[in-house]
């Protein structure tokens, strides 16, 4: 697979999946441990309502600052923006955020928090970056397909339509 975790597997990294997804104060430091926990918990979690683990609707706007130390001790914070926004402290000076589904208002909030760089994994269109699933659906529609495409087909269309990530310098690093 070519997920965000694979990008960081050779770096010093802490995965916050248990911390922010399940409120279990246990950072994971390798893809192997992430895989082990996923194998253990996925059979149970997939039978429960998504809303128990993921902010839906108005819950996406509700902030609950939690586990601040993990935000502050990492230079790069990567993941789902709904989780980042929900749990982040008010100040993240000099941090780099890698995410998507960011609006213009979210960018301003990150600027006010002191975030130095925002990288979205999908392009910014009309002031917001969309989720990867939205971009995948767009590519499937552009291809005229009624099913998911192969990795090669996605890459071909990404090149054809010049779809790129976005990097914004929000604040000078303190």
Segment roles from a protein language model:
Residues 87-91:
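Short, T/G/N/S-enriched strand-turn elements that build extracellular solenoid repeat scaffolds
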Residues 3-8:
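Short, small-residue-biased leader/transition segments that mark boundaries at the very start
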Residues 75, 95, 116:
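Conserved acidic residues
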Residues 98-174:
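C-terminal functional extensions of proteins
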Residues 13-17, 78-79, 99, 118-120:
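General beta-strand structural signal in soluble alpha/beta enzymes
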Residues 13-27:
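Conserved catalytic alpha/beta core of Sir2/sirtuin-type deacylases, generalized to analogous enzyme cores
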Residues 1-2, 19-22, 81-85, 100-105, ...:
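Gly/Ser/Thr-rich loops at beta-strand to alpha-helix junctions
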Residues 23-76, 82, 92:
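Active-site rim loops that border cofactor/substrate pockets in soluble metabolic enzymes
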């Amino acid at each position: 697979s070519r997920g965000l975790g694979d990008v960081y597997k050779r770096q010093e990294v802490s995965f916050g999946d248990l911390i922010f997804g399940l409120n279990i104060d246990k950072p994971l430091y390798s893809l192997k441990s992430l895989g082990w926990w996923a194998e253990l918990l996925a059979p149970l979690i997939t039978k429960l309502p998504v809303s128990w683990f993921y902010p839906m609707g108005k819950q996406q706007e509700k902030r609950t600052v939690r586990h601040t130390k993990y935000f502050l001790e990492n230079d790069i914070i990567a993941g789902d923006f709904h989780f980042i926004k929900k749990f982040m402290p008010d100040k993240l000076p000099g941090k780099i955020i890698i995410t998507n589904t960011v609006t213009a208002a979210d960018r301003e909030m990150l600027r006010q928090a002191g975030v130095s760089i925002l990288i979205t994994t999908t392009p910014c269109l009309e002031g917001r970056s969309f989720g990867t699933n939205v971009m995948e659906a767009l590519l499937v529609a552009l291809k005229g397909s009624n099913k998911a495409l192969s990795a090669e087909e996605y890459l071909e269309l990404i090149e054809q339509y010049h779809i790129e990530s976005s990097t914004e310098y929000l604040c000078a690093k303190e």
